[in-house]
Amino acid sequence: MQLKQLAATCLLVSTAAFVQAKPIWQDFSLTGLYGENYEVVDEKQTTLTIEYAAKVKYADVFFFMDRMRGSDDHKSTYFELSPRLSLGEVSGQKLAFGPIKDVLISTTWESNNDDFSSFDNFLYGVGFD
């Protein structure tokens, strides 16, 4: 998946998720990193990292994407999109017990695309706050 397609997909997903939901809080960061003398990856590498996290009444979401480029022009994109749905907020019931404040349906889409291979993993389960 190309970077433009990935960015458009994430923007569409974020917009659809928050059309009717004003964020209680949200945070965005953009970080650039350049390094030399790596032993495991290309000797010189530039990495751009985008992160976004937000909480709305019924859910929260965390997203990050690393776009890496080596001096040999090898490119790689890795991202994770992790929305969680609050069962307490959806049901209107207090689901707190002991140190647990809420029970959530937790999901993650992790994906990697580079010059050699790519993968998509979809994870789901129960989460606790």
Where on the chain are the PLM-derived regions?
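Transmembrane beta-strands of outer-membrane beta-barrel pores
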Residues: 32-38, 67-71, 107-113
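Outer-membrane beta-barrel initiation region
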Residues: 22-53
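Cleavable N-terminal export/targeting peptides
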Residues: 1-24
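Residues that define the transmembrane beta-barrel architecture of outer-membrane proteins
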Residues: 44-48, 75-79, 118-124
